[in-house]
Amino acid sequence: MATAAKSSFGTYLKLGDGGTAETFATIAEVKDIKGPKLSLNTEDVTSHDSTDGWAEKIGTILEGGDVSFEINWLPANVTHSHTAGLLKDMVGRTKRNFQLVVPAAASLTWTFPALVTEFQPELKVKGAQTASIKLEIAGKPTLA
């Protein structure tokens, strides 16, 4: 059987402007993206009446987890900078809407509110100026 696998090349991560009719700007030079890591919390509801002594659980709340990604860090770029971009949002503790656009998956778009919780530059002598970023999802994501 032939594979139906798709390349993830061309996926975009976008940052919302917070406007009423929100506009999303593509975050410049995003490299690898990992996440979102969705999870369901559970509660153990095992009782003395549980069948054959097996643990019983119920689902409680859902969590959006986080999204981590690498960028070719461009400090003056509006989506990266300390005056208007990701670094400013982290320092200001600003919750923003983000979009993860996966064109290879029939244009799947995840939209989610998140906080920038990590911004770690890497400045190698023999290498490109990069940064690792982590977003913590702070509400319900939507899929379209």
What are these model-derived regions, one by one?
Residues 2-73, 113-128, 134:
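Solvent-exposed edge beta-strands and adjacent loop segments
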Residues 52, 76-81:
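Short, structured coil/loop segments at alpha-helix boundaries
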Residues 72-74, 103, 138:
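Short, loop-centered acidic/histidine patches that primarily coordinate divalent metals
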Residues 79-113:
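Short, acidic/charged, Gly/Pro-enriched secondary-structure junctions
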